[in-house]
Amino acid sequence: TEAGQFYAMYGGASENANQRMPSGTARVISPNAKVELTVSEGIGYGMLLMVYMSDAQNDYQSEFDKLWKYWKCYGKGLNGNGCNSWSGQGMDWQVDNYTGSIGGGTASDAEFDAAVALIMAYKQWGNSSYLEDAKKLINWTKSNDMQSDGSVRPGSNWNDAFNPSYSHVGAFKLFQEVTNDAFWNTAATT
C-alpha cells in the first residue's frame, strides 16, 4: 500500500505495514518496535495532533476519524473486530498488525489524550458524536483507570505504581466540565 511504502521509507516498517488493518482506519507505528507495533498512546497523540493542526486552510478531520476508528476497532477485548461494537472502552495498549492485540489492558494516559482530542474535535468541527464518544470514554476511564479516591491507575489491568506523568490535571478539569461529575475535580487535586 502507499502508506506501507511511506513507512518503509521513513520508519523501516515493511510495505505490508497496514495490510491487515480494518478498512477506513489509520495508525501510528511505534518507531522503536521490532514488530510493526501500535500503542494506544500513539493513537491518542495522533488524534490530538490532527485536531490541533486543523484550521481553515488545513483540515485533518478525515485523518482524525481514521485514527479514532482504529481506536474503536481495538477497544479493550475487541482485537480489531470491534469497529461497530465499541461501547466506550479504552484501546488495548499494544497492537501488532499481524497478530492483533498483544497488550493485556489499556494505558490511562492514552485514554486521557483520546478523550481530550474528542472534546476538542467537537469544538473544532461541531460534530456532536465526538462529544458523545468522549463522554463514553471518560465514564469508562473513571471506572477502569481511576481509583475511587481520584488517583490514577497506570491502566485497566494493573495498579503496580503511580506514574506522575499520568496525572493529567487539565484533562480532569475538562472532563468535569463536560460530564458535570465532581469526581474529576477530586482527581485534579489528588
Please annotate each region the language model reported.
Residues T1-E41, Y52-S101, S148-G150, V178, ...:
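Low-complexity, Ser/Thr/Pro/Gly-enriched N-terminal "stalk/linker" regions
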Residues P31-T38, D59, I102-T106, Y122, ...:
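Conserved aromatic-histidine-acidic binding/catalytic patches
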Residues K34-L48, G105-D113, N159-S167:
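Aromatic- and histidine-enriched alpha-helix N-cap/loop-to-helix transition segments
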Residues G42-N58, Y70, F112-N127, S167-N180:
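Well-ordered alpha-helical scaffold segments within catalytic/enzyme domains
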Residues S62-C73, I102, V116-Q124, S129-K142:
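Active-site-adjacent structural elements in enzyme catalytic domains
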Residues D96, G100-G104, F112, V116:
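Structured domain cores in non-transmembrane regions
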Residues S108-M120, G150-W158:
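Active-site groove signature of glycoside hydrolases
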Residues S128-T190:
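A surface/extracellular/periplasmic glyco- and lipid-processing/surface-interacting theme
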